[in-house]
């Protein structure tokens, strides 16, 4: 049986979501997206140049069959984020939206108050809202109560590559909310993606870790393997951590005793 997961009315098999920014060129982006095996690709609505057509358009280089996830990157108020989400729907990108309301330009940490405000409005308008948020369990619960279809806590600041700085809070979030938890931002390498999945994340979203790698296509393959391996480890169930050793072979019945 396929290990599927869903958000709202949308079901997926791949647990890796990818972005479209920071690639050296569109052909490299296209090859990396295909190599990732991802089914969902996020696009910054405010950064789309709608005047470009054909091969000059970013959208033309996204592999066929990938689900577009418009995001509200570069929005610093709830009002901006709401307008941008509406624009994405007008451009026929669907009802899914990765909601971002940025509170600080240097760290790109979310404005929690604005995020919750925007989420409530968009949920009422029929959007399936996936909010990029901090790693605070209280905020995650408020976003769930606001009607969000998932929560997307950061592992570390966007583009930092620092990995999961607070895995304990992420685990608490997973225990606190009933909606899917996707780790978003901060992943630097495949082991970070694997750890997120081992903690119990439903999926992982990343962009910079692949796009700015020395070999984006190879890194996309590595991230795919990391996510798949981490998911299998979570399902298999790791052994408990112990302070002292536990011999793999029994001590009774040894030869010469």
From Swiss-Prot:
UniProt-recorded name of the protein: Thiazole synthase
Q: Where does 1-deoxy-D-xylulose 5-phosphate bind?
A: 159, 185-186, 207-208
Matches recorded under CDD domains: ThiG
What's a Pfam family this protein contains?
ThiG
Q: Name one GO cellular component term.
A: cytoplasm
Stored InterPro entries: Aldolase_TIM (IPR013785), Thiazole_synthase_ThiG (IPR033983), ThiG (IPR008867)
**Lineage: superkingdom:** Bacteria
Q: Where in the cell is it found?
A: Cytoplasm
Which example biological process does GO assign this protein? thiamine diphosphate biosynthetic process
- Which Gene3D superfamilies does the entry mention? Aldolase class I (3.20.20.70)
Q: What is the organism field in this record?
A: Anaeromyxobacter dehalogenans (strain 2CP-C)
- Associated pathway: Cofactor biosynthesis; thiamine diphosphate biosynthesis
Which GO MF term does the entry hold, naming one? thiazole synthase activity
- E.C. numbers: 2.8.1.10
**What is annotated as the active site?**
98
Q: What family name appears in the similarity comment?
A: Belongs to the ThiG family.
Catalyzed reactions: [ThiS sulfur-carrier protein]-C-terminal-Gly-aminoethanethioate + 2-iminoacetate + 1-deoxy-D-xylulose 5-phosphate = [ThiS sulfur-carrier protein]-C-terminal Gly-Gly + 2-[(2R,5Z)-2-carboxy-4-methylthiazol-5(2H)-ylidene]ethyl phosphate + 2 H2O + H(+)
Q: What task does this protein carry out?
A: Catalyzes the rearrangement of 1-deoxy-D-xylulose 5-phosphate (DXP) to produce the thiazole phosphate moiety of thiamine. Sulfur is provided by the thiocarboxylate moiety of the carrier protein ThiS. In vitro, sulfur can be provided by H(2)S.
Query: Subunit details for this protein?
Result: Homotetramer. Forms heterodimers with either ThiH or ThiS.
Q: Which UniProt keywords apply?
A: Cytoplasm, Schiff base, Thiamine biosynthesis, Transferase
């Amino acid at each position: 049986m396929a290990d599927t997961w869903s958000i709202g009315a949308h079901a997926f098999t791949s647990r890796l979501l990818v972005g479209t920014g920071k690639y050296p060129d569109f052909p490299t982006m296209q090859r990396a997206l295909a190599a990732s095996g991802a089914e969902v690709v996020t696009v910054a609505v405010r950064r789309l140049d709608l005047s470009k057509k054909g091969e000059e358009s970013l959208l033309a280089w996204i592999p066929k069959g990938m689900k577009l996830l418009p995001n509200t990157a570069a929005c610093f108020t709830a009002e901006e984020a709401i307008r941008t989400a509406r624009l994405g729907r007008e451009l026929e990108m669907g009802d899914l939206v990765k909601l971002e309301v940025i509170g600080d330009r240097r760290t790109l940490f979310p404005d929690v108050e604005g995020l919750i405000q925007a989420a409530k409005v968009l949920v009422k308008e029929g959007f399936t809202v996936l909010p990029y948020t901090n790693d605070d369990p209280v905020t995650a619960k408020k976003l769930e109560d606001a009607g969000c279809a998932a929560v997307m806590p950061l592992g570390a600041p966007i583009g930092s590559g620092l990995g999961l700085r607070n895995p304990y809070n992420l685990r608490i979030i997973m225990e606190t909310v009933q909606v899917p938890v996707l780790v978003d931002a901060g992943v630097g390498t495949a082991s970070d993606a694997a750890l997120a999945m081992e903690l119990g994340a439903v999926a992982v979203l990343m962009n910079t870790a692949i796009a700015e790698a020395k070999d984006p296509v190879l890194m996309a393959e590595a991230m795919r393997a990391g996510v798949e391996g981490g998911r299998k480890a979570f399902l298999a169930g790791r052994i408990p951590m112990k302070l002292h050793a536990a011999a793999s072979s029994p001590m009774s019945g040894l030869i010469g005793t």
